[in-house]
Swiss-Prot record:
The gene is rplP. This is Large ribosomal subunit protein uL16. Keywords: Ribonucleoprotein, Ribosomal protein, RNA-binding, rRNA-binding, tRNA-binding. Part of the 50S ribosomal subunit. One of its GO terms (molecular function) is tRNA binding. PANTHER family: 50S/60S RIBOSOMAL PROTEIN L16, LARGE RIBOSOMAL SUBUNIT PROTEIN UL16M.
Amino acid sequence: MLSPKRVKFRKQQRGRMRGVATRGNTIAFGEFALQAQECGWITSRQIEASRRAMTRYVKRGGKIWIRIFPDKPVTMRPAETRMGSGKGNPEFWVAVIKPGRILFEMGGEEITEEIAREAMRLAQYKLPIKTKFIGLDDQEKVAGSDKPASVPAITAES
């Protein structure tokens, strides 16, 4: 399972998840991707379960890229412990996900859209957030819509 080799601080505050992903929201390596539709935490175990589901389905057909990394420690107190006496110990690691973030990418010569869609669907079931399957052509359509509407030229009337 994924976790950082070493961190500067062992414990973090939980934080807030506001806004949309400004980084990691475009397809960079493959042709197909799984994009987050809502915010949440994804644990290293959930990432590994999704990766295994996709890998088993595509077998040796293509390549899978994991675009998220669990770098936030979540602490827990032991069961039936009284209040006080400090913060608990780190129990597991999570990746903080915002809407629009690309979670997984898939590509290769033998990967068709149908195979990629089914593999991503199997991965979706392992995740606690809503996700959407996108391809490179879908991304280009979205990127093209960001252009400002053409402004009519101003002519000087005399």
